[in-house]
Amino acid sequence: MQTADIRNAWLTYFGDRGHTVVPSASLVSDDPTLLFTVAGMVPFVPYLTGVVPAPFARATSVQKCIRTLDIEEVGRTPRHGTFFQMNGNFSFGDYFKEQAIAYAWELLTTSEADGGLGFSPDDLWVTVYHEDDEARQAWKRIAGLPDERIQGLGRDTNYWHTGQPGPAGPCSEIFFDRGPAYGADGGPATDDDRYVEIWNLVFMQYLRGAGTGKSDFEILGDLPTRNIDTGMGLERVAFIKQGVENMYETDQVRPVLDRAAELSGRRYGADHEDDVRMRIVADHVRSSVMLMSDGVRPSNEGRGYILRRLMRRTVRAMRLMGVDAATFGELFPASRDAMKAAYPEVSDDFDRISRLAYAEEETFLRTLSGGTTILDVAVGETKAKGGERIAGDTAFLLHDTFGFPIDLTLEMAEENGLTVDREAFDRLMLEQRTRAKADAKSKKTALADLTVYSEFRAAGETRFTGYDELETGTTILGLIVGGHSVDHAVAGDIAEVILPETSLYAESGGQEADAGSIVGQGFDLEVLDVQKPVKGLISHRVQVRSGEVGVGDAATTIVDADWRRGATQAHSGTHLVHAALRQVLGQDAHQSGSYNRAGYMRLDFAWNQALSPATRSEIEDIANGAVRDDLQVVTRVMPIDEAKQLGAMALFGEKYGDTVRVVDIGGPWSRELCAGTHVSSSAQIGLINVVGESSVGSTNRRIESLVGREAFQDLAVERAIVSQLTSSLKTPREQLPDRIADLLQNLKTAERRIADFEAQALQQRVPTLLAQGSRVGSVTLIQESLGSVRSADEVRQLVTLVRERAGSDPVVVALAGDAGGKPTVIVATNQAARDAGAKAGQLARAAAAVLGGGGGGKDDLAQGGGSDVSAIGEALAAVRQALDS
């Protein structure tokens, strides 16, 4: 059976039995605690846990999933993959254990011709929780399985829970026996290579208490409703039904594997390590295509980092098979063609996917070339010293300078039989992050643990009234202090406030949260932040300015009108700039991110080259033309399919429900799906002033603008600057560019003359320094403190000049200088000195130790530095001593 046949058989079977067929959710999960959708049940968690009432009693889906926890196993086992599809059937308080078992057995053992999967009953084994006699008896009664093919196992394998207090229950797993060629007899409890798990039935019926580990917890009682959550791995069933050895050889994955074999000239099946690499390529390319089709872009954090890691592991695998050139142009289309029938968005969006992928590959090929050289040197030096571990500072250098992710360094070290000093690397990373954040001040702090919100979300969604009003009367539904639900908060407390309705906008869609207050009889709360910690619930982080607030108190939410006005100007301005971008650059220049706050907007868009000043001006002029035209802004709520038919733009990476809000500016001039707040006519924006355009990675650009009052203020400042320049330079405004260009040219000419003079001055010092050489053993040492110097480069130039003029006898040159309060010692050796055993790197480190710093370099040229300028004389003495030892 082809993968599509298995998928269709599943959906048809359960659809015919009253299950609502639910399309796959995005790989980007709604759950803020998850980077990705990691299991088929993830989109149904709110229904299974009772936080949100289920809109159906039964459901079925084929859910696309991403898991990278076992990424090191990919390619090495028959069933580990980072992307997989999970067939699931779910019951929300409807049928339970016996019916779930009956459905599973019928679908598995019914012939393919009759709509089933055609498994022989003799090849199937099951496991149950050892205390779940109900499930054991159901299997015997329904399937006729003998006791020896129903194995009872413990909580660690056959009991489902989330890892924290909440829903739990026993589970029953179904296994396929691949036969004695794959392992020992004895069932799943004996050998999980021979016996492959294909389906897991979870009977969610109990409430578990606190505990640790997989099995150390208490069962508190029964759940109000009993639910069913099952999952069948589509790829696992496919490789069994297609008679191949592993999931990488199935019809949806094999085309990429075959293309990798063709590109590398290696034959699949001829060499184990090459086979592993081809399987890695096949898996990771498919995962990358699917992630990018759901809006994920390569980056250095979060989801984007996972995608980048998958793509870079692919490049590495191809290089290890001898392919140094770019290959994504061949591999990605192979995956697209294999997946587009099940997921048309892969094909529809492939132009964008391929551009991103090819740019990422080219960037990493350059990174790999430079970083590999550094790592090869480190490997050689480590082995030469008899070491087993690459230094943490080397790994940090690779990460910080060459963009090498630490996991790649770890892999390459392991390939050379070495490890990495991860503790030192992590320490350096922490120091870097601490420095980066030292001056950052933010009003945001972490929200409470997500579990505290479940009771509030169960009461219903927070209704946002801020589209129509700035003040809303409401009631305090809940208070959270220090991560715990409380009944009151007093002056000075920082708390989260949960309300049934609010006029305060929660940060989302690139728009910053509203500023404002929440007031009531006897209390005044300053709103610091507004967020959506879980879907449908708004939390207001506040400081109690005065009084005491309690649960049940009447309250009024008040939005800062000036703040909201500026935010709406910025958000509507973003839509205009986006539309103008696409008019000028074409439809490929779509938005990839945005940020709006009062008076400021930032728009990231897909583009791989800088915009010329003329293009920037054209975009700004078009956007301001729309402002002057006073276009009406109309918002409508409608089904998403209707919105797409109208041409409303859905932004990549955003997640939308069945019903969406469409924002029109001037009818079709700008039409986007958007839940943000907006002006009622474009003239209210006032002015858009583009103030910057820059790169955000290799495939994105960023355009920044001031909007409204801030834009006018910025123009006033520019006007004042121009007036000052015309006065200072005694030049009319229209002639300023030429006048400034002349001044800059004169400055460059003067700088060149100064540089020539300094070079001559350095040359004149060489004879004096050569005459000061003294013997240290078999080597002549020339050393001197130069006093104050402009930079370390000046010292380096002079050291190099002296070495070149020193002749062929063994010579070491060590010169020091004070570069703005930073002592520098630079050491150079000629070939004869190196033959005599003198190494510049060792000598520079000896000097640096005295200066209170560090140093190093190559045997022919090295540098040391520190913080103690007064110790320069001692540092030069240390060079002599090290040379003499």
From Swiss-Prot:
It catalyses: tRNA(Ala) + L-alanine + ATP = L-alanyl-tRNA(Ala) + AMP + diphosphate. SUPFAM superfamilies: Class II aaRS and biotin synthetases, Putative anticodon-binding domain of alanyl-tRNA synthetase (AlaRS), ThrRS/AlaRS common domain, Translation proteins. One of its GO terms (molecular function) is tRNA binding. Keywords: Aminoacyl-tRNA synthetase, ATP-binding, Cytoplasm, Ligase, Metal-binding, Nucleotide-binding, Protein biosynthesis, RNA-binding, tRNA-binding, Zinc. It is found in: Cytoplasm. GO terms for cellular component: cytosol. Its EC number is 6.1.1.7. GO terms for biological process: alanyl-tRNA aminoacylation. It is an enzyme of class 6 (ligase). Zn(2+) binds at H571, H575, C674, H678. InterPro entries: aa-tRNA-synth_II/BPL/LPL, Ala-tRNA-lgiase_IIc, Ala-tRNA-ligase_IIc_anticod-bd, Ala-tRNA-synth_IIc_core, Ala-tRNA-synth_IIc_N, Ala-tRNA_ligase, Ala_tRNA_ligase_euk/bac, DHHA1_dom. Binds 1 zinc ion per subunit. Gene3D superfamilies: 2.40.30.130, 3.10.310.40, 3.30.54.20, 6.10.250.550, Bira Bifunctional Protein, Domain 2, Threonyl-trna Synthetase, Chain A, domain 2. Its cofactor is Zn(2+). Consists of three domains; the N-terminal catalytic domain, the editing domain and the C-terminal C-Ala domain. The editing domain removes incorrectly charged amino acids, while the C-Ala domain, along with tRNA(Ala), serves as a bridge to cooperatively bring together the editing and aminoacylation centers thus stimulating deacylation of misacylated tRNAs. Belongs to the class-II aminoacyl-tRNA synthetase family. This is Alanine--tRNA ligase. It comes from Clavibacter sepedonicus (Clavibacter michiganensis subsp. sepedonicus).
